[in-house]
From Swiss-Prot:
<dbReference type="GO" id="GO:0008237">
    <property type="term" value="F:metallopeptidase activity"/>
</dbReference>
<keyword id="KW-0482">Metalloprotease</keyword>
<keyword id="KW-0862">Zinc</keyword>
<comment type="function">
    <text>Acts as a receptor for B.thuringiensis Cry1Ac delta-endotoxin.</text>
</comment>
<keyword id="KW-0645">Protease</keyword>
<keyword id="KW-0378">Hydrolase</keyword>
<keyword id="KW-0031">Aminopeptidase</keyword>
<protein>
    <recommendedName>
        <fullName>Aminopeptidase N</fullName>
        <ecNumber>3.4.11.2</ecNumber>
    </recommendedName>
</protein>
<comment type="similarity">
    <text>Belongs to the peptidase M1 family.</text>
</comment>
<dbReference type="GO" id="GO:0006508">
    <property type="term" value="P:proteolysis"/>
</dbReference>
<dbReference type="GO" id="GO:0016285">
    <property type="term" value="F:alanyl aminopeptidase activity"/>
</dbReference>
Amino acid sequence: GMYTHEGSDP
């Protein structure tokens, strides 16, 4: 996505 979130949308 907008930012990297561990285990979620990049």
